Amino acid sequence: MLLYPAIDLMDGQVVRLQRGEAAKKTIYSTDPVAIAKHWEAAGADWIHLVDLDAAFEGKSRNLEVIRAIVAAVSVPCELGGGMRDAASIEAGLATCVRRVIIGTKAAEPGFLAMASATFGPDRLAVGIDAKEGKVAVKGWIETMELTALELAREAVDIGIRTIIYTDIATDGMLQGPNIVAMREMAAAVQCDLIASGGVSGPDDIRELATVPGIHGVIIGRALYEGRMPENLRSILE
């Protein structure tokens, strides 16, 4: 089980949202590079970066900060938020992150196949955000009829190896992950599945680690509110 501390960026600051709502924003730090180095020292396997400005507005204000984070840490980084065309994917990869996460556009017919052919499936992950099992897009503002399981199968068929699955109802709420949904997804697709949303403490991570097929977990608000041990690796020992 790999640990992915999350750094959500808005206007160059580290923030957390509740259920993805920009109005429910908490600013945790004005120094994202220091935060990334702190999580690396704590035992992060990856750093999970989200460009919220790009996600909500389609335009990034954080690329220089992201580039600085990647340069400052030795663990790999991944970047999500606003990956809606080839140019934005190229700009994201130009920050030297290991891979970018395609969310909204993954549900558009043909887009994933194009991105995979252009950039290679190893440089891409698919972020599937779900409300009651249905795919949510455009910063979680719209919900589609497409189910999360259907989209996951399509992505794997194209050659995508990493899927990040977020249950929106639990995200940022510190009430525990949706284990049932995570089990369903892990059983449905053969890929590196990363669970996201709702982790409230070490016990949630230990429970996710018992689910076959879950490769990693993204930890957000619980980290910033002191609910995790200083040594993150000790959770799984």
PLM features per residue range, with description:
Residues 2-6, 46, 74-78, 98-101, ...:
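Structural preference for beta-strand elements that scaffold enzyme active sites
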Residues 12, 19-23, 90, 97-171:
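Conserved anion-binding
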Residues 60-67, 141-150, 175-184, 233-236:
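Charged helix-capping and loop-helix junction motifs
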